[in-house]
Structures are given as C-alpha cells and as structure tokens.
Curated annotation (Swiss-Prot):
A GO molecular function held by the record: protein-membrane adaptor activity
Membrane topology category: Multi-pass membrane protein
Family listed: Belongs to the WRB/GET1 family.
Protein name listed in UniProt: Protein GET1
Stored InterPro entries: Get1, Get1_fungi, Helix_hairpin_bin_sf
Coiled-coil blocks: 74-101
Organism whose genome encodes this protein: Chaetomium thermophilum (strain DSM 1495 / CBS 144.50 / IMI 039719)
Lumenal side: 1-3, 132-155
Keyword Transmembrane helix: yes
Subcellular location, record wording: Endoplasmic reticulum membrane
Listed GO CC annotations: endoplasmic reticulum membrane; GET complex
GO biological process: tail-anchored membrane protein insertion into ER membrane
Function text: Required for the post-translational delivery of tail-anchored (TA) proteins to the endoplasmic reticulum. Acts as a membrane receptor for soluble GET3, which recognizes and selectively binds the transmembrane domain of TA proteins in the cytosol.
Gene: GET1
Length: 209
C-alpha cells in the first residue's frame, strides 16, 4: 500500500473519530465487549441484569403489600429489597471501575493509532516526496512551501499532503452532515404538517349572522 493512501486513510479515521465522538465510540465498544459471550465481564453483566430484574419485581411486590395488614410479608420483602439493592450497588461499582479502565485503555490505543501515528509518519518520512509537481509550472515560493519542511524542492511533503487530506475530508464530512441534517429536518417538517380540519363542502363559506 502506498504511503499516499496510508496517510489518506489515517486522516479519514481521525476525521470520523472527531465527527462521531470519542465518548460515543467508547460506549459502543463497551457494549459490544459486554455482549461477547467469552469476555471476562459478560457473566458479571448478565448477573447484574438478572438482579435488576429481580429487584424490580421485589420492589413491585413491596409496593403492593401493606405494612399494616401483611407485616410479616412486608418485612420479608423489605429485607430482600435492601439486600438486592446493596448487591446491585456493589456490582455497579465494580462494573464502573472496569468501564473506566476500559475507556482509559481505549483512549491510549486510539491516540497511538491516530495522533501518535500521524506524528511518527511525519517524522519518519519528512524527507520523502509524496509526489512531484510538474517542472516549471509553479513559482519558486510555491515549490518551497509545498515541500516544507524537508522534502526535495519541487515535490509535495508528507506534512502538506497530510494537511490537504485533513482539510478536504473535514469539508466533505461537514457537507455530508449538513445534507443529512437538512434531509432529516425536512422529513420531520413533512410529518408534522398540520392536517386541515373537516369543514363544509369545497367552494362554500360561512356567512356572518
């Protein structure tokens, strides 16, 4: 794979991450991780869901039981309710701790694979031309500018190519998002268009009394 394409794909990933949002990506990956049957936390998450369901049922039964008419049953349900609440709070604290660690690791990996890779490629290939400009088509200052900082004169450097890809992709993604927002807003307006109330026959009007 050519370096030109690698830089373009890397910038595309960076722009998509910026558009979607790092927090949203972390949440989606966390849910996906919990849904994997063999993952270490899948069992804990399933237990938490089961306890939540049991807790809601006990709370429903507790609310439906009178503490005066059925005190023994009410006291038993209250003890079970408190026990399940404590267990859920402990389980939630454990999962929250795992989630924080998971998000921290994702942030580190994402930085290495995006920003870190950007800096590394710019440093490692700073003197390598991405492609050459047609000879004699551009003035000296343009050739010097596009070859900044260390590429041969008359060529396009990796820094300039990276900046160009980033700028073009940002504009394209912004245009696509604007079209999506406009299309969605138009559809909502059509759905909310008021329906005229049933009145008299067409061509008739009410007369003032």
């Amino acid at each position: 794979m050519s370096l030109l394409l690698v830089i373009f794909l890397l910038e595309l990933v960076v722009q998509l991450v910026n558009t979607i949002g790092a927090k949203t990506i972390n949440n989606l990956l966390w849910r996906f991780y919990l849904s994997i049957p063999g993952s270490p936390l899948a069992k804990d998450f399933a237990e938490q869901r089961a306890k939540q369901k049991e807790y809601l049922q006990v709370r429903h039964d507790l609310n439906a039981t009178s503490s005066q008419d059925e005190f023994a049953k009410w006291a038993r349900l209250q003890r079970k309710h408190d026990k399940l609440m404590d267990e859920l709070e402990k389980k939630k604290s454990q999962l929250d701790a795992h989630r924080t660690s998971f998000s921290r690791k994702l942030t580190i990996y994402r930085w290495i694979l995006t920003r870190g890779m950007q800096w590394f490629l710019c440093f490692w290939f700073s003197s390598q031309p991405m492609f050459w400009l047609p000879y004699g088509w551009f003035p000296y200052w343009v050739e010097w500018l596009v070859s900044f900082p260390n590429a041969p004169m008359g060529s396009v450097s990796i820094v300039v190519w990276q900046s160009a890809c980033s700028g073009v992709l940002a504009l394209v993604i912004e245009a696509v998002m604007a079209v999506v927002r406009y299309t969605g807003g138009t559809g909502m307006q059509k759905q909310r268009q008021p329906v005229p109330a049933a009145g008299g026959a067409p061509g008739t009007s009410k007369k003032d009394l």
